[in-house]
Amino acid sequence: DCYIAGLQIDSSASEGAGIYVDLPGGITLQKSTLEEAVKAYGEPVDRFEGEKEVLLTYEYGMYRSVQLGFAKDTGILARMDMKNMRNTEGMDVASVSSNPTEEVQNYTAPEGPGDVLGDFVVEYDGQFYQLPTPVAVFEKNGWVLNEAESDYAVMYGKYGCVTLEKNGVKLYAVVNNYGEE
């Protein structure tokens, strides 16, 4: 089994229009403003102002970042890209197997929101997830793997992509295979 180590959601695309994600600090995709995000998370390490969007970047180490995109015309959080590409504690990156790893079997979902954005805890559809999250956890919560739009297999120590679907909504995710076989 693989972990989802990143989420990228763009509410301006038809696939992301119905996705509302709650982040720590009371920030919600498609509802919160840039000012609310800066108040909740502090100043970003980078702020880019494009033609249609203001993009804030928060970094929490190598391959661990959150980008929040706010529509210039509304000031509302319209896009998010979270990546937490790290090995979970005690995990050795090593081959492809259909057997769930010990880390997948021992994953415990958070019971509530994280305290800070760098906790990588999100709430979606009434469920809390802490990235990286096993794909199987999303499947247990009603998400279905779209095999046609997902990598067939991800070799150990490598990254791949999966598409999960639920109630007509698509979630595109980056996965990392932490298995040893």
Language-model segments: which ranges?
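N-terminal export/targeting and maturation segments
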Residues: E111-G142, N146-A148
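Amphipathic, alpha-helical segments enriched in basic
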Residues: S12, G16, N99, N106-A109, ...
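Generic detector of short, locally flexible boundary/turn motifs and exposed helical patches
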Residues: Y20-L23, V45, V104, P110-G112, ...
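A cross-family detector of function-defining hotspots
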Residues: D1-G6, S32-A109, A136-E180
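Non-cytosolic head/periplasmic domains of membrane-anchored proteins
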Residues: L7-L29, Y41-G42, E49-E51
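Second-shell loop/turn segments in exported
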Residues: Y20-T28, F120-F128, C161
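Short gly/acidic/polar-rich coil/turn motifs that serve as flexible hinges in modular proteins
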Residues: Q30-K31, P132
